[in-house]
């Protein structure tokens, strides 16, 4: 006879206690007066503080009505008389909703309601009035918090049933006991705690709850007796001991844009700040950390009265600005200068409004951190760095430290904290115990940090979190805890700690690798505008030195728009479609504004501080050649550093006999090349070095099925190569243009839904091979890459970081190397032997696949969540294949990459000082207009000395003067900033 499993039908002790706990919570609300006079008006938010109303009139809102629309705003008014029975009592507004609501009562901001809290305290702010008038503004997002979870649809759906609004009073005895039991039940249910203590808690909670007769008038007396029993028997017990030391830091992560547009973040931020300020009124021990200068700036602009209240709490030390940066940016894709400006404009705001320089960087949710960050932070007045995802989201390896020292690409060091548990918790005992057990630096790092507060869409700390925290000292089995601010934790545990471990390298996140590629157009425009604003600042500065006005405010406005759109859910592509459209609109505005600042000149200006000598395409209607559909000609500009010259079409054209084409083969002064019909290169013999560069696939376009699952826009899985989508040759490779400078071959490939045109150009006077791509992309769950298997024996690939390069292993000896199958790079990667190698230089791509001898440049993705239209449409981009002798540094790959990415600008300006030896990263006027600020970065890993014809100020990146000198010794990969008095 088969064994039949017996299903347990009786309740476990903790389940029986939990059931009665639910009964107890019904009695928290004492008096409950329905508010009947409620009206609502629906709207669509169109800017940060402007709305388009669907109707001119308010309509009645009654219990049972559907209200709110997806991605919709609603304005709600309500009015109620306060009966004599409720006067002189502590009154609350009770409203259970899935929306996010800001509440004013009798003209005063009293708090916020959202899915994490359902009531707002009124009495301290409105006194004891006869009548209360409510004005509420609510927002309802376009999707549920978690569409994977069917239960979340009912709680946080886009359309919801109005369950009524009430004026209520709270039974403080019930509420207090609820918090006691909630705290203890969390321990009883968690296997992280001592089993004997959990049994003790369950037994004694049962005894306490047995004192309450829920169905009789003696219930209030029983509740008081149960409260006393819990205190005297459970909380007083010290027979069980815990261990650990955990700092509790309150914060709220606020995504500027994600499943909502940036314009909605203004109200999300107001609601979050209001809630914390109101909690501070009631909990004198409460300290709260809040990041992103942009959120403070928007609060000051749109809600100045709340900002003034916030400033008072900042002065008290209870509301703590953290983060240093303007927003929480992605830390892989932005340029070094963009990351500097994030700190510069962030610190500028904090200094001007709070009189302080923030000494920490607070980036809990970013998708990995570039190796260039420590130097930037250190030179922006930041000593401490906080992130989180490496310890909680890695898919393969556990990041080995939580409190440590992070050493940057140039040797700069900052203290770093990567807390062992998620940055969104609700401060329950089990979460704190989990944090301590996961903490890896118990012997060297001091306390561990546990962040608490709801986040992503803001919200922050709740009354429940603070009440539970007040009970921690009564529970002997828990780690020791102390509530403190973020800066206090960092300074107490990290500053001067000589026992801390050191991490020297990038902080790579083993997840979200797809964000290097998703939303390709945003990444292309971001890079183009990063360089265009560099040009605009340099040109404007040189003009200002000749007496012209400097457009400082316009440049600042443009920079801030760029910085906002580098937020870690905008530039990486992990957002809904309206966010994408907002970013495009910002980029169009910035592009147009910068064009107006730059103007137009007869000559071409070389903003690079080295001679431009790479063959370049110049647009000209009379030209005989084309590039990206524009007519023009190819020539070597030979423009001196920071100088300008008129470029004209050469009078003499070379014969086209330099390129011998025979079917799918071509011979140039540099190479003998063999092509496949799809544009792949099957042979590339370098005549200069007498060596073959191809050893397998080379310039092969491949499209893969790309189904990472839940985190569609975010992730690429290691098995993406399992299924290759067949590419048909729509139009085989053929010669299309041949001139005295360039020879072009065109091939068109396709899938059932997409068309991909590749134009391969080879040149008479340059060894570069350019591949232009024009794509009409209509795929779903696909990843396009171009693959290279060079005939090079190297166990590492050099990858540009934007301010130096990083060497990454190509082998898979360890799980750490295997997990880095897709990494972020900037303008180029290079794989070389000591006497030569291959560089691939791009104009807008960031993802690089690394698999032993095969390297791949990620070109396009096609994801559906959270944006079903992601990347659909037309794309144009190019990359260079650049074989060379010697190393990447010997071959000046950085210079070639800068020339490829920074087009010549028409402007009649020049500069005598060319700052040889380092890359001119930025030139601008200081904020006070007193100095010309010049930023230079060493890109090739070499030491050097720079001498100046006059004394200059050495500055930090915040433009503070450090000292005067006429020469500077610089280290490999160092960024220096100098100030030249006007």
What feature does the model see in each segment?
Residues 66-84:
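Short beta-strands within extracellular/lumenal beta-sheet-rich domains
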Residues 373-378, 388-392, 400-403, 437, ...:
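C-terminal (or distal) subdomains of carbohydrate-active enzymes
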Residues 1-60:
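Accessory carbohydrate-binding/adhesion or oligomerization-edge regions at the termini
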Residues 87-105, 134, 605:
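Aromatic-lined ligand-binding clefts that engage carbohydrates, nucleic acids, or primary amines
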Residues 331-352, 420-440, 722:
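Alpha-helical scaffold elements lining the catalytic groove of polysaccharide deacetylases
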Residues 230-248, 268-283, 298-357, 369-379, ...:
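Catalytic alpha-helical scaffold of carbohydrate-active enzymes acting on polysaccharides/glycoconjugates
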Residues 255, 259-273:
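Fold-level signature of zinc-dependent metallopeptidase catalytic domains
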Residues 127-217, 221, 245, 253-254, ...:
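Active-site and substrate-binding clefts of carbohydrate-active enzymes
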């Amino acid at each position: 006879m088969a064994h039949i499993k017996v299903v347990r039908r009786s309740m476990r002790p903790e389940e029986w206690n939990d059931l009665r706990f639910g009964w107890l919570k019904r009695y928290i609300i004492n008096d409950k007066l329905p508010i009947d006079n409620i009206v609502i008006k629906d709207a669509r938010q169109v800017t940060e503080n402007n709305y388009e109303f669907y109707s001119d009139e308010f309509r009645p809102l009654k219990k049972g009505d559907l209200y709110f629309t997806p991605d919709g705003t609603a304005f709600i008014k309500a009015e109620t008389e306060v009966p004599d029975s409720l006067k002189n009592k502590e009154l609350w507004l009770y409203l259970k909703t899935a929306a996010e609501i800001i509440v004013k009562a009798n003209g005063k901001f009293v708090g916020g309601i959202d899915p994490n809290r359902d009531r707002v305290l009124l009495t301290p702010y409105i006194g004891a009035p006869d009548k209360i008038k409510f004005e509420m503004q609510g927002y309802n997002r376009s999707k549920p918090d978690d569409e994977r979870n069917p239960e979340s649809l009912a709680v946080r759906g886009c359309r919801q049933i109005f369950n009524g609004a009430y004026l209520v009073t709270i039974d403080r005895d019930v509420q207090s006991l609820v918090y006691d039991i909630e705290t203890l039940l969390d321990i009883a249910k968690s296997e992280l705690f001592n089993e004997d203590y959990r049994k003790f808690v369950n037994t004694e909670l049962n005894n306490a709850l047995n004192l309450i007769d829920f169905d009789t008038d003696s219930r209030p007396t029983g509740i008081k007796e149960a409260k006393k029993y819990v205190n005297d028997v459970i909380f007083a017990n010290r027979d069980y001991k815990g261990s650990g030391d955990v700092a509790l830091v309150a914060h709220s992560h606020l995504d500027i844009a994600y499943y909502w547009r940036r314009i909605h973040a203004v109200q999300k931020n107001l609601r979050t700040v209001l809630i914390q300020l109101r909690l501070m009124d009631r909990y004198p021990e409460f300290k709260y950390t809040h990041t992103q200068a942009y959120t403070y700036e928007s609060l000051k602009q749109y809600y100045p009265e709340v900002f003034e209240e916030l400033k008072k709490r900042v002065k008290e030390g209870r509301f703590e600005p953290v983060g240093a940066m303007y927003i929480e940016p992605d830390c892989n894709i932005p340029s070094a200068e963009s990351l500097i400006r994030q700190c510069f404009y962030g610190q500028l705001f904090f200094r001007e409004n709070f009189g302080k320089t923030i000494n920490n960087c607070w980036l809990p949710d970013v998708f990995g951190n570039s190796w260039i960050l420590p130097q930037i932070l250190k030179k922006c007045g930041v000593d401490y760095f906080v992130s989180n995802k490496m310890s909680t989201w890695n898919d393969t390896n556990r990041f080995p430290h939580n409190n440590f020292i992070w050493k940057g690409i140039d040797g700069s060091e900052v203290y770093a904290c990567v807390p062992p548990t998620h940055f969104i918790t609700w401060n329950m005992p089990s979460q704190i115990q989990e944090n301590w057990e996961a903490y890896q630096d118990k012997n060297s790092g001091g306390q561990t940090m546990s962040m608490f507060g709801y986040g992503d869409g803001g919200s922050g700390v709740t009354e429940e979190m603070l009440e539970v925290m007040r009970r921690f000292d009564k529970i002997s089995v828990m780690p020791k805890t102390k509530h403190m601010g973020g800066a206090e934790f960092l300074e107490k545990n990290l500053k001067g700690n000589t026992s801390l471990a050191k991490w020297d390298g990038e902080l790579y996140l083993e997840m979200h690798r797809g964000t290097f590629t998703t939303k390709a157009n945003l990444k292309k425009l971001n890079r183009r505008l990063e360089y265009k604003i560099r040009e605009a600042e340099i040109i404007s500065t040189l003009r200002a030195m000749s007496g012209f006005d400097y457009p400082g405010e316009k440049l600042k406005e443009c920079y801030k728009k760029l910085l906002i759109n580098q937020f870690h859910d905008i530039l990486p592509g992990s957002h809904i479609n309206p966010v994408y459209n907002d970013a495009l609109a910002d980029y169009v505005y910035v592009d147009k504004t910068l064009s107006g600042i730059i103007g137009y000149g007869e000559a071409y200006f070389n903003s690079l501080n080295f001679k431009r000598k790479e063959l370049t395409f110049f647009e000209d209607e009379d030209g005989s050649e084309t590039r990206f559909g524009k007519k023009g000609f190819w020539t070597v500009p030979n423009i001196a550093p920071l100088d300008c010259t008129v470029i004209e079409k050469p009078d003499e054209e070379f014969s086209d006999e330099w390129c011998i084409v025979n079917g799918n083969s071509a011979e140039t002064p540099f190479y003998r090349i063999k092509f496949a019909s799809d544009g792949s290169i099957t042979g590339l013999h370098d005549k200069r070095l007498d060596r073959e560069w191809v050893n397998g696939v080379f310039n092969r376009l491949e499209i893969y099925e790309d189904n990472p699952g839940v985190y569609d826009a975010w992730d690429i899985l290691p098995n993406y190569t399992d299924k290759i989508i067949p590419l048909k040759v729509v139009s085989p490779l053929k010669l299309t243009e041949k001139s005295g400078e360039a020879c072009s071959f065109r091939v068109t490939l396709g899938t059932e839904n997409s068309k991909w045109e590749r134009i391969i150009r080879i040149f008479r006077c340059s060894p570069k091979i350019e591949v232009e791509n024009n794509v009409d992309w209509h795929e779903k769950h696909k990843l396009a890459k171009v693959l290279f298997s060079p005939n090079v024996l190297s166990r590492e690939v050099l990858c540009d970081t934007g301010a130096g390069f990083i060497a990454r292993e190509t082998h898979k000896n360890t799980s750490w190397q295997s997990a880095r199958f897709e990494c972020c790079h900037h303008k180029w990667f290079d794989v070389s032997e000591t006497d030569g190698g291959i560089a691939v230089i791009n104009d807008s791509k960031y993802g690089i696949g690394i698999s032993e001898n095969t390297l791949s440049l990620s070109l396009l993705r096609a994801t559906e969540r959270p944006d079903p239209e992601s990347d659909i449409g037309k794309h144009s981009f190019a990359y260079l294949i650049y074989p060379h002798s010697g190393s990447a540094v010997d071959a000046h790959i950085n210079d070639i990459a800068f020339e490829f990415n920074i087009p010549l600008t028409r402007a009649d300006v020049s500069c005598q000082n060319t700052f040889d030896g380092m890359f001119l990263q930025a030139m601008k006027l200081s904020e006070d207009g007193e100095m010309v600020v010049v930023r230079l970065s060493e890109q090739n890993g070499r030491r050097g000395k720079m001498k100046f014809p006059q004394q200059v100020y050495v500055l930090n990146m915040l433009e503070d003067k450090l000292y005067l000198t006429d020469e500077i010794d610089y280290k490999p990969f160092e960024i220096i900033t100098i100030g030249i008095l006007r």
